[in-house]
Regions:
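Arginine/glycine-rich "motif VI" loop of SF2 helicases in the C-terminal RecA-like domain
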Residues: 133-138, 175-179
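Active-site-adjacent loop/helix micro-motif of nuclease/hydrolase catalytic cores
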Residues: 118-128
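Nucleic-acid nuclease catalytic cores
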Residues: 135-167
Length: 396
C-alpha cells in the first residue's frame, strides 16, 4: 500500500491540529505515530480505513508562514498562489498540499480560514479579501465559522445578545462559487458557547452545522475523489444559514429568504433585485467622520443609488439611467477631470458605489473596512465597475 504525503501549512500549530481533528472525525484510525522531525515540524503517520478501504497517510505540519519578512521555511507556499493570480496581501489560516513523488513538489489542494470572532458589523467582512484573492487562483476555500457568538457587556462581560452577520456576507461565498466556478463556502460549526436552551436560538436547526461535511470534503479531496456531493452539501447549509440570518435581520429593508432563493436559482441577480426593491442607499456615517465634502457626496449617493441587498451596507448601485446626473453632481464636489468622468459614463452598465472607512484614530483598528471591496465583488461580480470613496476622521 503506497503512502500518500501531505503538508498542512498553518499560521500556527493550532490551525494544523484543528484541520487534522476535523479529518479524524470521519476516519477509523488503525494506527498513528506522531513525532517531531525538526524543532518546528511535526509528522503524523496514519493508517486508517474510510468507507471500508484502507489507506496510509503521512501528514507534516508546517506551522508559521514565511510572511512579515520571516524566513522560517526554505520555500514560501504563498508564491504558488501569487503566481496563479492572488494579488492581495491577505493570507488564509491554513493551506493543505499534496507532496508529489517526483522532486517533492507540492500541489495546493485547498485553503482554510477559521473564525472564532464575533461575526457582526465590519468584522464580518474583514476577511473577505483573503477569500476573494485565494479563490480567484482556482484554489478551493473553506471559511469555517464558530456559531454562535455573543455581544458582551463591557463592564460585567456577561452575555447580552447574539450577534449575527448581514446575510449578504455568507451569500457572497455562494455567489462567488457560481460566478468563478471554484468552490468556496462558509461552513458553520457549533461553538463552545452554543446553548440550545437559549430562547434566542429557539427553532434553530442544528443539522446546519457542517463538521462532518468539512471532514468528508477534506478526506475525499486528499484522496483524489470527486467532492461534488460534499461541496453541494456545504453550499446548501451555507444557504440555510443565509436564510436564518435574513429571518433574524432587524427591519424590513433586507432581502428575505424567498429573495435569496430566487437569486440562488438564477431567476434574478443581487443587483437586479436591489434595483427592483428600490431601497434608498442609507448607510449611516458618524458625524466625526464627516470631513471635506463627504456629507454632500453621501446626499448625492442617496439621491441616485439603491442599497444592495439592504439599505445600510456601505455600498449601493446607481442604475445606468442615473449615472449622468450623478456624475454631474459629483464633479461639482471633487476635482475630477472630464476624461475621468467620461470613463464612468462610457458604458451602458450600472455603477456601484463603495464607501470605505480608512482608519480609526485611536489605533484599535487601523483597517476597519478591509475586505469590503472584495466582499462587494464576491456578492455581485468582479466585472462590475465600482467607484470607491475612502473616508475617515481626518483633519487634512
Amino acid at each position: 500500500m503506497q503512502i500518500q504525503i501531505f503538508k498542512i501549512h498553518g499560521d500556527n500549530i493550532v490551525e494544523c491540529e484543528r484541520i487534522f481533528n476535523f479529518i479524524s472525525r470521519r476516519i477509523n484510525i488503525i494506527d498513528i505515530n506522531k513525532q517531531f522531525i525538526s524543532q518546528a515540524s511535526i509528522q503524523l503517520d496514519v493508517t486508517f480505513t474510510y468507507n471500508k478501504s484502507k489507506f496510509q497517510w503521512r501528514i507534516i505540519y508546517h506551522p508559521g508562514f514565511n510572511k512579515s519578512n520571516r524566513t522560517r521555511w526554505d520555500n514560501n507556499i504563498f508564491d504558488s498562489l501569487k503566481a496563479a493570480g492572488s494579488f492581495l496581501d491577505e493570507t488564509p489560516d491554513a493551506i493543505i498540499t499534496q507532496v508529489g513523488s517526483e522532486e517533492q513538489k507540492e500541489k495546493i489542494l485547498c485553503a482554510i480560514e477559521f473564525c472564532s470572532a464575533l461575526q457582526a458589523g465590519n468584522q464580518a467582512w474583514q476577511r473577505s479579501g483573503r477569500a476573494y484573492s485565494t479563490i480567484r487562483t482556482g484554489c478551493p476555500y473553506l471559511y469555517i465559522v464558530d456559531f454562535v457568538k455573543y455581544e458582551l457587556d463591557t463592564t460585567t462581560r456577561k452575555r447580552k445578545a447574539i450577534r449575527t452577520p448581514n446575510p449578504a456576507i455568507p451569500y457572497s461565498y455562494i455567489n462567488n462559487t457560481q460566478q468563478e466556478n471554484v468552490f468556496g463556502a462558509q461552513a458553520f460549526v457549533k461553538s463552545e458557547e452554543f446553548d440550545e436552551s437559549n430562547p434566542l436560538l429557539k427553532n434553530f436547526d442544528e443539522s446546519v452545522f457542517s463538521e462532518d461535511d468539512i471532514a468528508d470534503y477534506l478526506i475525499n479531496l486528499m484522496l483524489g475523489y470527486d467532492t461534488t456531493e460534499y461541496e453541494d452539501s456545504l453550499l446548501d447549509k451555507n444557504l440555510r444559514m443565509v436564510n436564518y440570518f435574513s429571518i433574524h435581520s432587524n427591519g424590513q429593508y433586507y432581502f428575505k429568504p424567498d429573495d435569496w432563493q430566487r437569486i440562488y436559482k438564477g431567476e434574478t441577480t443581487v443587483l437586479e433585485l436591489s434595483k427592483e426593491k428600490k431601497w434608498q442607499f442609507g448607510k449611516k456615517i458618524a458625524e466625526k467622520s464627516m470631513t471635506g465634502h463627504l456629507r454632500e457626496f453621501v446626499k448625492v449617493v442617496k439621491k441616485y443609488a439603491y442599497g444592495i441587498s439592504c439599505k445600510d451596507l456601505p455600498f449601493g448601485v446607481i442604475p445606468v439611467q442615473n449615472k449622468a446626473s450623478f456624475v454631474k453632481e459629483m464633479v461639482s464636489l471633487y476635482p475630477i477631470s472630464l476624461n475621468e468622468a467620461q470613463t464612468i459614463l462610457e458604458d451602458d452598465h450600472d455603477l456601484l458605489i463603495c464607501l470605505i472607512k480608512g482608519f480609526k484614530p485611536r489605533g484599535d483598528d487601523n483597517r476597519p473596512d478591509r475586505g469590503l471591496l472584495p466582499f462587494l465583488a464576491m456578492l455581485t461580480s468582479e466585472h462590475a465597475k465600482v467607484l470607491t470613496l475612502i473616508y475617515g476622521p481626518m483633519t487634512s
